[in-house]
Amino acid sequence: MTQSLADMRRDYTRDGLAEDQAPGEPFALFHQWFADAVKTEQVPVEANAMTLATVDGEGRPHCRVLLLKGLDEQGFTFFTNYDSAKGQQLQANPFAAMTFFWPALERQVRIEGRVQKVTAQESDAYYQVRPLGSRLGAWASPQSRVIAGREELEGLVKATEARFSDTQPHCPEHWGGYRLLPERIEFWQGRASRLHDRLNYRLVDGQWLRERLAP
C-alpha cells in the first residue's frame, strides 16, 4: 500500500444544503438530487446504484449494492429473487436501509423504512422490459445457493434457453419487486473541514418533519 489509510482523505467544497433550499417533504428533494446525479456522475458510477442493508432472523446485518428501479410517492423499488438471501432476510425482518452515494456531487442519501412486495402485475411489467438474457437468468440462477462451479451455472442457463426456445419467458413466481416505504430520509452534503450539512426527514403521524443533524 503506497499511502497510509490514515492519510487518505479529501475535503468537500462543492456545495451546501440550507433549509431554505429544501422542500417540506423529501421526495421532491430526492428527485432533484437524483436528476443532478444522472447528469453529473460518470461511468463507472451508476446514479441509481445504492447499498441495501437487511437484517436476518438472528439479528445479523447484511448489505450489498443494487440498482433502484422504481420511485413514486409510495417509496423506492428494487427487484430480486424472492428465494435469495436478501429475500429470506426481508421475510424474517421486513425493514431495510438504503444508501445512495454520488461522489462527483459530494452527496449521500440514507433511507430507512418497512419493505413490502410489489404486486405481481408490477413485477411482471418490469420483468417484460428486461433484456432476454436477464429474463432467462431469473429462471436459471438459484440465487445465493452454493453451486459446484461456473460450468453448473452455464448448464442451467442452457437448459433454461432450451425450455423457452419456442416461447418468451414469463415472470417466475420466485422473482419480483420490493418497495421500501420510507420512514426516515437523510440528505448529506459534504462540506469543508468535515462540517457537513445533514437534513433529516422523519415521518411522524403521516407528516414529514424536517430537522438538521450535527455532522
Swiss-Prot record:
Instruction: Identify the metabolic or biological route this protein is part of.
Output: Cofactor metabolism; pyridoxal 5'-phosphate salvage; pyridoxal 5'-phosphate from pyridoxamine 5'-phosphate: step 1/1; Cofactor metabolism; pyridoxal 5'-phosphate salvage; pyridoxal 5'-phosphate from pyridoxine 5'-phosphate: step 1/1
Which keywords describe this protein according to UniProt? Answer: Flavoprotein, FMN, Oxidoreductase, Pyridoxine biosynthesis
Tell me which EC number(s) this protein carries: 1.4.3.5
Which residues take part in binding FMN? R64, V65, L66, L67, L68, K69, F79, T80, K86, Q108, Q143, S144, W188, R198
GO aspect biological process, one term: pyridoxine biosynthetic process
Subunit description? Homodimer.
HAMAP family named among the record's database cross-references: PdxH
UniProt xrefs under PROSITE patterns: PYRIDOX_OXIDASE (PS01064)
Organism annotation = Pseudomonas putida (strain ATCC 47054 / DSM 6125 / CFBP 8728 / NCIMB 11950 / KT2440)
- Protein name (record): Pyridoxine/pyridoxamine 5'-phosphate oxidase
Which reaction does this chain catalyze? Answer: pyridoxamine 5'-phosphate + O2 + H2O = pyridoxal 5'-phosphate + H2O2 + NH4(+); pyridoxine 5'-phosphate + O2 = pyridoxal 5'-phosphate + H2O2
Root EC class: oxidoreductase
Binding annotation for substrate: R9, R10, D11, Y12, K69, Y126, R130, S134, R194, L195, H196
Protein family according to the UniProt entry: Belongs to the pyridoxamine 5'-phosphate oxidase family.
Names of the cofactor(s)? FMN
In its keyword annotation, does this UniProt entry include Phosphoprotein? Answer: no
